[in-house]
């Protein structure tokens, strides 16, 4: 409940500062960003430059807020779009998996220290690695995605970026968008 209140208050402040992203209770899924971001500095890491907190690889799926780049990873206009894509991917391909199963699928041991990743996310969220089930319709997913993005290398983001990403997912993806699985 506290998270919902925080998200609503943050949204109201940003709507006042940057103008509304919603009209008639519908989000404009073609807006660019709530804030102004410039992550073109090559000294920042790839997930941060690409506003891609989940370090999502390019596939045939087209995401809202997607931009073009030359790397093998998706890039987005702002962090909230990257988080929305992350929530979409978790929803479509990870729902019902335990925390451990989801992270082993997201970050396989071939490329990652997956066990360390699982322990980190479980510790930071307080979720049991074998009991917590991925469910994007439960706001506990916000903390899950936040700590995943930390291990994926996202820097300079805020809790608001994660929460806005969840709102973007809710308005632009959930139950409204039919997308092919990867």
Task: Go through the PLM ranges and name each one.
Residues 1-4:
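Positively charged n-region of N-terminal signal peptides that target proteins for export
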């Amino acid at each position: 409940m506290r998270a919902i209140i925080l998200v609503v208050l943050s949204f109201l402040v940003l709507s006042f500062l940057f103008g509304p992203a919603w009209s008639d209770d519908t989000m404009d899924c073609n807006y660019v960003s709530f804030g102004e971001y410039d992550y073109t500095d090559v000294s920042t890491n790839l997930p941060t430059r690409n506003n891609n907190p989940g370090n999502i690889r390019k596939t045939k799926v087209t995401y809202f807020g997607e931009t073009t780049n030359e790397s093998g990873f998706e890039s987005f206009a702002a962090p909230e779009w990257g988080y929305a894509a992350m929530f979409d991917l978790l929803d479509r391909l990870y729902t019902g998996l335990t925390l451990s199963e989801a992270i082993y699928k997201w970050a396989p041991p071939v490329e990652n220290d997956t066990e360390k990743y699982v322990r980190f996310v479980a510790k930071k969220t307080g979720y049991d690695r074998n009991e917590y089930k991925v469910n994007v319709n439960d706001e506990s997913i916000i903390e899950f995605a936040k700590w995943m993005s930390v291990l994926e290398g996202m820097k300079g983001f805020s809790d608001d970026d994660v929460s806005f990403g969840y709102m973007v997912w809710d308005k632009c993806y959930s139950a409204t968008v039919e997308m092919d699985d990867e």
